[in-house]
């Protein structure tokens, strides 16, 4: 069963560039006395980051729409970077206050994303100042994104460029695979694939350079582009965290493809979930909202997964990857969750408490026994838009974990000669599983981090632009 609902919310080296960005930061950093003895609260941190992300979206829309970029928007990025790297942050560990205690979280992803964006924008604005009457696409072609991102590769700059060349050739073969004038399909996971992992799901925010490149790539080279993520659409979810236009050429899903944002509406696939299960999850979600505004538990809004309301479950972060939460507090929080489950489901026949990992637990609604995975999500969106994975045409699936393999398997079943796969990360067992599904090595690609594919996408767009001039 499918239901529709309106949305309820809405060539300078990299090192030289880094010094330039740092010089700008020195001009806007507050003095030590400005933040002495003041710890940012969890809510203040989230508010700061969401306000900054709004500025990112404005910049992305300006670039895509060939409009002016306001200096105030760039200044907001700089102010945010200065704030989150002030004296309360040491080695990317930021100390914050909760209602009754202190919390230390890792903000490396948030800080690095902002730094790379500032380097990207500096080059873009410098190019614009020398070519004031030129539109953004030709100016973007003058920005060597690979030279900015290479310094942040997890292994080495040399490895970055090796993977970059391989990925660029791979994407060329995908983009040039038009069959009878029919562009290919692009389907991707999000976290760890198109976006670096972040210690806090609630502030796992997409940078500008990534949003601009992905949107242009989807529009220029594909007939269907879709993001499938395990997280929700809202609350926060992918629609809150992305910097891409949510009603643009890239479609967004949450809950493994159970919920989609299509035509300005949330489309939900309820297969196997009872009405009482939905109702119980909704009431528990309300209970969790109240719990997070009480005493020690407020910090759990920013611990790992936070509180994610998915179609068939709640996913709750109970510990950070660095073990910053006291075990006793984590256990008390989980007990408080169970107590609220009992309020909602006193007979214990609707909701199931699943301590899935050391970092998060899940509260799952009983279902009819059907096991939903991302392959089901792919099928639903492809059929909804009246398309097919079948030949003719290529289908590129991108992922970074074993949970993404069902998408590859589905595409390989429907289109064995046209399926392609790009996987991110260093897990050799996962890579071997991909090789078994796609035996033609020209139709698979392995890279170490998302920035490699963003640099390759940007360069491919530049090549196509230059070839038409």
Where are the regions that the model predicts?
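Phosphate/oxyanion-binding active-site loops and adjacent basic polyanion-contact surfaces
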Residues: 203-207, 277-284, 369-378, 402-404, ...
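Active-site phosphate-binding/coordination module
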Residues: 205-306, 310
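Short, surface-exposed amphipathic charged segments that create phosphate/polyanion-binding patches used
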Residues: 263-274, 369, 460-468
């Amino acid at each position: 069963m499918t239901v529709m609902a309106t949305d309820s919310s809405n060539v300078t080296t990299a090192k030289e560039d880094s010094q330039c960005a740092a010089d700008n930061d020195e001009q806007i950093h507050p003095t030590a006395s400005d933040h002495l003895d003041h710890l940012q609260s969890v809510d203040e941190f989230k508010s700061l980051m969401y306000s900054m992300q709004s500025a990112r979206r404005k910049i992305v829309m300006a670039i895509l729409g060939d409009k002016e970029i306001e200096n105030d928007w760039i200044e907001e990025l700089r102010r945010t970077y200065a704030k989150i790297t002030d004296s309360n942050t040491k080695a990317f560990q930021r100390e914050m206050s909760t209602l009754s205690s202190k919390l230390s979280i890792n903000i490396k992803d948030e800080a690095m994303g902002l730094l790379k964006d500032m380097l990207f924008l500096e080059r873009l604005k410098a190019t614009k100042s020398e070519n004031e009457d030129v539109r953004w696409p030709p100016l973007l072609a003058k920005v060597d994104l690979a030279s900015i991102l290479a310094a942040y590769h997890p292994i080495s700059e040399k490895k970055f460029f090796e993977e970059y060349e391989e990925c660029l050739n791979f994407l060329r073969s995908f983009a040039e695979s038009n069959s009878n004038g029919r562009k290919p399909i692009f389907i991707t996971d999000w976290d760890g694939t198109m976006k670096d992992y972040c210690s806090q799901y609630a502030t796992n925010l997409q940078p500008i350079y990534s949003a601009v490149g992905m949107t242009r790539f989807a529009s220029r080279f594909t007939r269907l582009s879709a993001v499938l993520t395990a997280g929700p659409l809202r609350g926060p979810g992918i629609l809150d965290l992305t910097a891409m236009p949510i009603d643009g050429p890239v479609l967004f899903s949450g809950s493994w493809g159970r919920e989609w944002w299509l035509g300005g509406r949330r489309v939900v696939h309820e297969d196997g979930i009872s009405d009482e299960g939905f109702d119980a999850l909704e009431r528990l979600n309300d209970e969790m909202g109240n719990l997070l505004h009480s005493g020690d538990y407020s910090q759990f809004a920013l611990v790992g997964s936070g509180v994610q309301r998915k179609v068939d479950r709640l996913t709750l972060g109970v510990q950070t990857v660095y073990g910053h939460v006291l075990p006793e507090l984590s256990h008390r929080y989980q007990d408080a969750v169970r107590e609220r489950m009992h309020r909602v489901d006193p007979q214990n026949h609707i909701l199931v408490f699943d301590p899935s990992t050391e970092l998060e637990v899940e509260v799952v609604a009983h279902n009819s026994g059907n096991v939903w995975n991302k392959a089901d999500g792919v099928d639903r969106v492809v059929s909804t838009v009246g398309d097919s994975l079948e030949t003719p045409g290529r289908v590129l699936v991108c992922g970074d974990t074993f949970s993404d393999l069902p998408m590859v398997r589905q595409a390989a079943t429907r289109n064995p000669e046209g399926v392609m796969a790009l996987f991110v990360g260093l897990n050799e067992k996962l890579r071997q599983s991909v090789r078994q599904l796609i035996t033609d090595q020209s139709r698979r690609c392995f890279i170490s981090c998302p920035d490699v594919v963003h640099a390759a996408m940007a360069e491919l767009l530049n090549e196509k632009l230059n070839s038409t001039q």
